[in-house]
From Swiss-Prot:
It comes from Serratia proteamaculans (strain 568). It comes from the Bacteria. GO terms for cellular component: cytoplasm. The active site is at 247 (nucleophile). It catalyses: cytidine(1407) in 16S rRNA + S-adenosyl-L-methionine = 5-methylcytidine(1407) in 16S rRNA + S-adenosyl-L-homocysteine + H(+). This is Ribosomal RNA small subunit methyltransferase F. Its EC number is 2.1.1.178. Belongs to the class I-like SAM-binding methyltransferase superfamily. RsmB/NOP family. Keywords: Cytoplasm, Methyltransferase, RNA-binding, rRNA processing, S-adenosyl-L-methionine, Transferase.
Amino acid sequence: MAKPACVFLPPAFLEATRAIMPADLSMDDFIAACQRPLRRSLRVNTLKISVTDFLTLVQDYDWRLEPIPWCAEGFWIERGDEELRLGSAAEHLSGLFYIQEASSMLPVSALFAGAEAPSRVLDVAAAPGSKTTQIAALMNNQGGIVANEYSASRVKVLHANISRCGVKNVALTHFDGRVFGAALPESFDAILLDAPCSGEGVVRKDPDAMSNWSPESVTAIADTQRELIDSAFHALAPGGVMVYSTCTLNAQENQQIVNGLLATYGDAVSIEPLGDLFPGAKQALTAEGFLHVFPQIYDSEGFFVARLRKHHSVPPLAKPSYKLGKFPFTPLSGKDSAEIAQAAAASGLAWDKTSRLWARDKEIWLFPAELEALVNKIRFSRIGLKLAERFTKGYRWQHEAVIALAVADGKQRFELDATLAQEWFHGRDLYPEPPPQTDECIVTYQQQPLGIAKRIGSRIKNNLPRELVRDGVLDFHQ
């Protein structure tokens, strides 16, 4: 458990929070919860491993895992050795789990509540990727997700996390989220708008989160949120579901934003109450059916979640005036696609018909078929994953493709022990005894793919991308 930090709570914030605090909750408990260290939590990445198999894998570790009630894959975690970063664990490096705050698992759980099975999803404010990867896992890498991030620097982090988790059904965009209603009207059957906010709920993680807080800043942020939710609603197809969420507590950024949408669009939209989302949800349920999570309720961050249903079309927004430019990819023929799939299978890689091959010069990419209809409607930073580069003598398979597409029973797999796996993540060449029998192999640890490598004599040449190389001590439970 992290050491307590002195959390700054502005007097005006405390006064505003006191005014909206439910009668069955106490301000003293709220302030005490804000001053306590935040419990660490993780979410098992079921694209890589089942929850049952994960629990079996780590059962001998000095980890105490407590299930998170609203996410079947989520657990609070306490470890015997807190000195080693959880992010340095072998299971994190290989994508078996994502370090994610418990409350932030709520919006995606709400999006997929009941029998909801969307095929095309928009994540309006996606970085760093916790919710995008959670969505991808619940979709089992099928369908398609447009993951948008306005901050250029955070797009790289978003891609890194998607790649580590073996996600293949995502397209990345880099826009102000207010463009989607005009650019892609009625194009998604589910939308997550985890809106930028004043961050009142995250003080346990960031003691200085409120240092720039003011009533004026809340008003300015709420203005943006109103525009974002309106745009997202236009991008939602009739019959579709949208979740609006924030990690803040005030009504101006939460209830008032949703109620404003209801007032604008009348019977085109309705609230779907979340009181039955999980056992104990009613402790945070508002009269309208939203979840308003104060940190003392579940000993978590503060959060707000609303689930909305669109019932029919609304008048469209003006079409955007931007120019897209020429799309640089072309779809591959059936013959070319079959040849590449055969070569990939020989190297231990495979995919299904929900992905299709496109080319840009010598690059071969694997696009989610569900998102092909959006090509030439909006500019993408990247779609799907880069599968290979084509050369005269064959193909050079790419790291992200190996992580997402390696088959479990491939003959080219070469299992490393803990010592060699750490060397791999440190970016060093390996000298296993005996060496692999094939010139090219997919190196694995705990049966999970770590990357692709070439055998040169008795040496395995390390091809781990430089940005993934780790320095320092790693936690491999030898």
